[in-house]
């Protein structure tokens, strides 16, 4: 047989082999998509606010939630990840916002462990940009979409995705953890907001020995902020020796311009010795600047917050006005989101797991990921999830 004929036959065989491989990959994706459930399961019960808290209760809560989180309290079994290569879309509302970036990195790490890829779409910090990013993600036909964007603002593309059997996994996409049938979220990953507020209240009650005079700052345009405000202020209001002085409604967009006169007004009304709580540490850079300008004492005015951006870690570490904050996990949330995708692909409900709340104070600010200004539990969560997904039993 001529050499050219041999080459032609060899090339034809390679082509048939390549086409067969593509067909097999396509079949694997089709099977996975056919089994995938995008429709959410029923919502979990709403978190319960602890309305009363003695000083002893508060001190016990603070002691427990400032400990290292070495114990894995998450799932130990669950569905294995399907074989094959899949692409997940990560729709970030704003890649200049640190939590969105860190959650995305967690998604990428979890996906990489399975040989999957992640395509990130950036909303550029606007509602219209995030909607466009979501539509682009949907057009890419991913196996699933993970997003920390407000699900209320994305209802059309979410409904379109669910209709196409593409599950939507939220990270902070709505107020409460678990599935959200109302919003079309197969799962929403977020810390227990009642425990976040309760932990702030516990710190204030414990450290004041039940004598705190407290002001709470909130942006009432957000439902989750209102819920966290209630979970923070209720135990303080019910503490017999404490007093809720005022709840200040401060729109986040106006905080820079309005904070200085607001703080001056609070000091005129309540003097120079009080606590302040909030579910949004973003206020506190402006609050601290206004307090310094007024000559306030760090010994008399103390700030307790939540979310714990790098500025909060820095203030707590250096001994600024902020003395404590409740952070939310960074990369763990990304792994939880990938685990929810694995559950959706198997057609089963997401794992009933909420990472326990952690409280950072000066004594532990550099633990549990704190050296990098983020909360990364030391419970080897990545190892535990990978054992479940791969069906292995590696020591963690």
Placement of each model-derived feature along the sequence:
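Flexible loop/hinge segments that line or gate small-molecule binding clefts
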Residues: 48-51, 152, 156-195, 213, ...
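Hinge/beta->alpha junction and helix N-cap segments in small-molecule ligand-binding domains
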Residues: 67, 91-104, 120-129, 172-173, ...
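N-terminal secretory signal peptides that target proteins for export/translocation
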Residues: 1-13
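Sec/Tat signal peptide C-region and signal peptidase I cleavage site
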Residues: 29-34
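Extracytoplasmic "Venus flytrap"
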Residues: 38-77, 85-106, 110, 114, ...
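Hinge/cleft segment of the Venus flytrap/periplasmic-binding protein
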Residues: 36-86, 333-396
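An alpha-beta-alpha
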Residues: 88, 92-93, 107-109, 195-249, ...
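Hydrophobic alpha-helical
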Residues: 147-163, 232, 251-315
């Amino acid at each position: 047989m001529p050499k050219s004929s041999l080459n032609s036959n060899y090339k034809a065989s390679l082509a048939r082999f390549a086409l067969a491989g593509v067909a097999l990959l396509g079949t694997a994706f089709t099977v996975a998509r056919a089994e995938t459930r995008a429709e959410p399961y029923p919502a979990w019960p709403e978190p319960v606010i602890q309305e009363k808290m003695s000083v002893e209760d508060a001190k016990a809560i603070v002691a427990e939630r400032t400990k290292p989180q070495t114990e894995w309290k998450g799932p130990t079994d669950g569905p294995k990840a399907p074989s094959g290569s899949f692409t997940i879309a990560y729709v970030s509302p704003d890649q200049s916002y640190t939590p969105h970036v860190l959650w995305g990195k967690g998604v990428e790490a979890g996906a990489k462990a399975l040989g999957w890829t992640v395509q990130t779409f950036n909303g550029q910090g606007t509602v219209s940009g995030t909607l466009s990013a979501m539509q682009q993600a949907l057009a890419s036909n991913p196996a699933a979409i993970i997003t920390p964007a407000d699900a209320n603002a994305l209802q059309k593309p979410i409904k379109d995705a669910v209709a196409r059997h593409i599950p939507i996994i939220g990270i902070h996409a709505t107020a409460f953890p678990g599935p959200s049938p109302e919003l079309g979220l197969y799962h929403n990953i977020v810390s227990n907001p009642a425990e976040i507020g309760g932990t702030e209240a516990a710190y204030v009650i414990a450290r004041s020995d039940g004598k705190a005079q407290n002001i709470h700052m909130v942006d009432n345009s957000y439902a989750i902020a209102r819920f966290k405000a209630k979970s923070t202020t209720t135990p303080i209001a019910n503490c017999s020796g404490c007093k809720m002085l005022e709840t200040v409604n401060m729109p986040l967009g106006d905080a820079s311009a309005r904070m200085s006169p607001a703080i001056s007004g609070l000091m005129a009304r309540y003097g120079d010795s009080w606590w302040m709580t909030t579910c949004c540490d973003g206020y506190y850079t402006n609050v601290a600047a206004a307090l310094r300008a007024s000559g306030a004492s760090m010994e008399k005015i103390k700030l307790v917050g939540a979310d714990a951006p790098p500025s909060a870690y820095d203030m707590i570490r250096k001994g600024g006005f902020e003395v404590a904050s409740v952070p939310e996990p960074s990369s763990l949330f990304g792994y939880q989101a990938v685990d929810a995708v694995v559950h959706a692909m198997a057609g089963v409900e997401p794992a009933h797991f909420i990472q326990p709340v952690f409280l950072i104070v000066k004594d532990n600010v550099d633990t549990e990921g704190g050296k990098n200004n983020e909360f990364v539990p030391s419970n080897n969560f990545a190892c535990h999830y990978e054992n479940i997904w791969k069906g292995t039993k590696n020591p963690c």
